[in-house]
Amino acid sequence: MPNRRPFAPAWIVAALGCVLGSHSAVADNHAACAAGKTLEDGVLTIATGNPAFYPWVLNDAPESKEGFEAAVAYAIAAAMGFEDNQVTWVRTSFDEAIQPGAKNFDFNMQQYSITAEREQMVDFSLPYYTSAMAVLTTEQAVADGLEPTIASLKGAIWGADANTTAVPMLSEMIAPDADPLLYGDNVDVTAAMQAGQIDAALFDLPTALYLSAVVVNDGVILGQFPAERSENPDQFGLLMEEGNPLKECVDAAITELTETGELRAIESRWLQQVTGVPVIE
């Protein structure tokens, strides 16, 4: 029998054309929005840390598009109508960028939490990341049988900074069998963990990533909870000079990436799969 190429009914072709045309129109609108609003015409200048750290940027090379914030930056740039070769990177310190005044970037990505105090000096975009709460523990606790399940976590010895929301969150998310041991600050919490006095503690994921890599010997992030289960979680925004007219264009791009699920997919890849931190349901 002769091979016959399957064909699409006319209504499918028409519908597909509408979808593609709509997507193209959205991209064109975003590009029109950004026109004349960047530091350098036709170029999007993005700042990151010096150096930039895993898993936000891999190998301190944001131009590789590898790492959560590097990938988000290029996704936002594309949604705003910029090609990869129209993106340029500069470096700043964390504190330097928060200060009021003129900036040498269009926006800065360094895990900046959106706060009312900071918004008095700079502008923030809509959030591109809502921080999940994560369980920090040690290799010894894992070897002793601690697992990323609610049943296992209930039996752990927990520690917490008495001055933070970690205590009510522990009660709400896990309801441990024993009351957590309370400390004056997170330094004391991590010291107690290293001394073997507690099995685990609850931190936002960015803090847990830092503590496991730099502070706690043999530190392990056992798992993370869905961000929507956290009360008033930290939200990261792109930092911009106060009054930057590009903000509306950036916000439109982030809204599009949120609605299409692209931001969630980037988060899943770089903050779950690559880090190996499972989600505790």
Predicted regions, residues:
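Acidic, polar ligand-binding/catalytic clefts
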Residues: Y74, Q86-S152, A227-R229
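Alpha-to-beta junction loops
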Residues: F82-D84, A102-Q110, A156, Q194-F203, ...
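Periplasmic-binding protein-like
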Residues: N50, T130-L136, L205-P206, A213-I254, ...
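A ligand-binding cleft/hinge motif common to bilobed small-molecule-binding domains
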Residues: D95-Q99, Y112-M121, S171-E172, D199-N232
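Ligand-binding clefts/hinges and TM-proximal coupling segments of bilobed small-molecule sensing domains
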Residues: D28-N29, Q86, T165-L181, A252-E281
